[in-house]
Amino acid sequence: GGSGGSGSSGNFTTASNIHMSSVTNTSIAGTGGTGGTGTGTGTGTGTGTGTGTGTGTGTDTGTGTGTGTETGTGTGTGTRNGTNSGTKTGTASSYRGGGVAIQPVTLTESLLNK
């Protein structure tokens, strides 16, 4: 806070019962920082006055950092569709006694699998 100025009293010689008086000055401290210095003035009327003012400013600064972790899981599904098709052909022949020849027969895969 600021320190108050000191007042000075007037010095009179016109009467013997006039005394010098001194005044103690106080000041109100500023908040938040260092106060200024006070100034005081005195007038010579047998009293002294002084005023002191103090101002202060303060600044608070802060920095912060934050870290975070994010994890996630996921599943994926898929379908596969396919068809396999084919044809197999073959010939079969046989000979039965009696002089009768059997004609070749074409066999497909569907007939062979039965």
Swiss-Prot record:
Its main location: nucleus. One of its GO terms (biological process) is rhythmic process. Residues 30-79 have a biased composition (Gly residues). It is found in: Nucleus; Cytoplasm, Perinuclear region. Residues 23-114 are annotated as: Disordered. It comes from the Eukaryota. GO terms for cellular component: nucleus; perinuclear region of cytoplasm. The keyword Repeat applies. The keyword Transmembrane helix does not apply. Residues 30-87 are annotated as: 28 X 2 AA approximate tandem repeats of G-[TN]. Phosphorylated with a circadian rhythmicity, probably by the double-time protein (dbt). Phosphorylation could be implicated in the stability of per monomer and in the formation of heterodimer per-tim. Keywords: Biological rhythms, Cytoplasm, Nucleus, Phosphoprotein, Repeat. Sequence repeats lie at residues 30-31, 33-34, 36-37, 38-39, 40-41, 42-43, 44-45, 46-47, 48-49, 50-51, 52-53, 54-55, 56-57, 58-59, 60-61, 62-63, 64-65, 66-67, 68-69, 70-71, 72-73, 74-75, 76-77, 78-79, 80-81, 82-83, 84-85, 86-87. Essential for biological clock functions. Determines the period length of circadian and ultradian rhythms; an increase in PER dosage leads to shortened circadian rhythms and a decrease leads to lengthened circadian rhythms. Essential for the circadian rhythmicity of locomotor activity, eclosion behavior, and for the rhythmic component of the male courtship song that originates in the thoracic nervous system. The biological cycle depends on the rhythmic formation and nuclear localization of the TIM-PER complex. Light induces the degradation of TIM, which promotes elimination of PER. The run of Gly-Thr is implicated in the maintenance of circadian period at different temperatures. Deletion of the repeat leads to a shortening of the courtship song cycle period, and thus could be important for determining features of species-specific mating behavior. This is Period circadian protein. It comes from Drosophila orena. The lineage of its organism: Eukaryota, Metazoa, Ecdysozoa, Arthropoda, Hexapoda. The gene is per.
